[in-house]
């Protein structure tokens, strides 16, 4: 059976062309500098959720799809499962400060590595000596070992509530 076509609606894109181009250059440079297989980035306007830029390295040219591997035809920015990395640290720090378990000036002794009770060793990205650091300093340097100590001050149920509050595990609407 045939279904008669109906007129569609007007679509207004929120992509900022200049920002899109700058972000694409930055991602391409980062991929090259880090010898990475690929890279993606998204810029979202806080408050509205509007997508201002969304880029994937090795994006296909729609006019010449044959020149790009089919592995790059989708958008990894919205489809590829990746670890959230250090972006997840914001949740733990926010919960700790908001719940008054720590303040930005609370200090911790922060070693390069920590062995967890289960035997797993967690270390920071770059080697460093043991440092006395504030919570603000730990966040600024993105130290995993400091994060663990801040996280120990926040109950698991509270951190879970904050994760849900930040929208983790929810669809973004871009899918």
Give the location of each predicted region.
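Short beta-strand scaffold segments in enzyme catalytic cores
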Residues: 41-43
């Amino acid at each position: 059976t045939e279904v008669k076509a109906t007129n569609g609606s007007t679509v207004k894109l929120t992509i900022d062309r200049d920002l899109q181009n700058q972000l694409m250059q930055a991602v391409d440079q980062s991929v090259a500098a880090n010898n990475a297989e690929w890279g993606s980035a998204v810029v979202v306007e806080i408050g509205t959720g509007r997508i201002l830029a969304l880029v994937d390295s090795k994006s296909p040219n729609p006019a010449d799809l044959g020149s790009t591997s089919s592995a790059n035809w989708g958008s990894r920015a919205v489809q590829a499962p990746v670890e959230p990395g250090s972006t997840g640290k914001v949740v733990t720090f926010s919960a700790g400060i908001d719940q008054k378990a720590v303040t930005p000036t609370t200090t911790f002794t922060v070693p390069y590595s920590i062995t967890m009770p289960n035997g797993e060793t967690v270390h920071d990205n770059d080697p460093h000596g043991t440092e006395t650091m504030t919570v603000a300093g730990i966040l600024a340097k993105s130290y995993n070992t400091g994060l663990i100590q801040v996280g120990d001050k926040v109950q698991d149920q509270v951190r879970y509530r904050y994760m849900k509050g930040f929208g983790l595990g929810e669809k973004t609407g871009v899918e």
